[in-house]
Swiss-Prot record:
Interacts with LDB1 and LDB2. InterPro entries: HD, Homeobox_CS, Homeodomain-like_sf, LIM_Homeobox_TF, Znf_LIM. This is LIM/homeobox protein Lhx9. Residues 353-364 have a biased composition (Low complexity).
Length: 397
């Protein structure tokens, strides 16, 4: 877009200064100013004519009185001294506007043409940009920095958690569901809300056709080829599954899936082994409270060295197995899976009752000489056992 020179005539430029009102200037000075302006206009006309003869003004065709140019905007004749040349057409200064926002483009450095219409830079990228932000659905210019997640592209300011609007940067862990981005904390909350604790991993996979809610990391894209082993099993956990039975002489394992793969590929599972003192602590507290709150989980995490997430899932699966064992006990008292008899519920006179005011505190859970109170059902009495290794809670798993 260029501002093209004045109209060319044979001898002089037709420009004449309009009548002006001068204050405080004598008549002689006014006459001198008028003569100087006329002299300059004649000089400009001679230079323009010489440039045209030398072929240096091929891109700026002058307007001649014989064949006046027509404005591409309004269709009228261009009689102004200056006009605009854009997309090989002549325009009045006032007629070159964006067709969307009506912004005058005479002072802009660039303008865009599409299907015969003129656009400013912002409207052109908004309407015809190749890529759009998956959050605000506005165009992304080629010079902007973006964040990529799966097949979606986001502005840096739009790559935030859909729940808390926390800005996610490179290296942060996040999750995606239905093209929405979540930070790690709210993604875990979303997982817990969608999948009830009593459902196991196999039931979830059978219902949903495979888990489709993996964690992502801002430093990379979707993994291709052979999966990598994770250094820390606590990172990138999708669903944690409690495996087999609890035994003090054998270590328990939590199965952790990596990113989901098609059924034709084999999935590798990361296993976390519990140490004996960790198992004793968790079992002892489970005998007191089947559903610990956040404060109790924090204390257990400090005592066992496990994360709150691992402890949550262990208690969820322990509660589910405890309920299954109670159902089997009501149906006959025999566990058909392992062929062992479950202990009968204690009667009202089956031992000394533990006073309610002497509940075992969390700091005493690893003491081998403590008294463990086992709660079988809500309407049954508690009884006293000798030590954690002989408690009836162990047989329930």
């Amino acid at each position: 877009m260029e501002i093209v020179g004045c109209r060319a005539e044979d001898n002089s430029c037709p420009f004449r200064p309009p009548a002006m009102l001068f204050h405080g200037i004598s008549g002689g000075h006014i006459q001198g100013i008028m003569e100087e302006m006329e002299r300059r206009s004649k000089t400009e006309a001679r230079l323009a004519k010489g440039a045209q003869l030398n072929g240096r003004d091929a891109g700026m065709p002058p307007l001649s009185p014989e064949k006046p140019a027509l404005c591409a905007g309004c269709g009228g004749k261009i009689s102004d001294r200056y006009y605009l040349l854009a997309v090989d057409k002549q325009w009045h200064l006032r007629c070159l506007k964006c067709c969307e926002c009506k912004l005058a483009l005479e002072s802009e450095l660039t303008c865009f043409a599409k299907d015969g219409s003129i656009y400013c830079k912002e409207d052109y990228y908004r309407r015809f940009s190749v890529q759009r932000c998956a959050r605000c659905h506005l165009g992304i210019s080629a010079s902007e920095m973006v964040m990529r997640a799966r097949d979606s592209v986001y502005h840096l300011s739009c790559f935030t958690c859909s729940t808390c609007n926390k800005t996610l940067t490179t290296g942060d862990h996040f999750g995606m569901k239905d093209s929405l981005v979540y930070c790690r904390a709210h993604f875990e909350t979303l997982l817990q809300g969608e999948y009830p604790p009593q459902l196991s991993y196999t039931e979830l996979a059978a219902k949903s056709g495979g888990l489709a809610l993996p964690y992502f990391n801002g430093t990379g894209t979707v993994q291709k080829g052979r999966p990598r082993k994770r250094k820390s099993p606590a990172l990138g956990v999708d669903i944690v599954n409690y495996n087999s039975g609890c035994n003090e002489n054998e270590a328990d394992h939590l199965d952790r899936d990596q990113q989901p793969y098609p059924p034709s590929q084999k999935t590798k599972r990361m296993r976390t082994s519990f140490k004996h003192h960790q198992l004793r602590t968790m079992k002892s507290y489970f005998a007191i409270n089947h559903n610990p709150d956040a404060k109790d989980l924090k204390q257990l995490a400090q005592k066992t060295g496990l994360t709150k997430r691992v402890l949550q899932v262990w208690f969820q699966n322990a509660r589910a197995k405890f309920r299954r064992n109670l159902l089997r006990q009501e149906n006959g008292g025999v566990d058909k899976a392992d062929g062992t008899s479950l202990p009968a519920p204690p009667s009202a006179d089956s031992g000394a009752l533990t006073p309610p005011g002497t509940a075992t505190t969390l700091t005493d859970l690893t003491n081998p000489t403590i008294t463990v109170v086992t709660s079988v059902t809500s309407n049954m009495d508690s009884h006293e056992s000798g030590s954690p290794s002989q408690t009836t809670l162990t047989n329930l798993f």
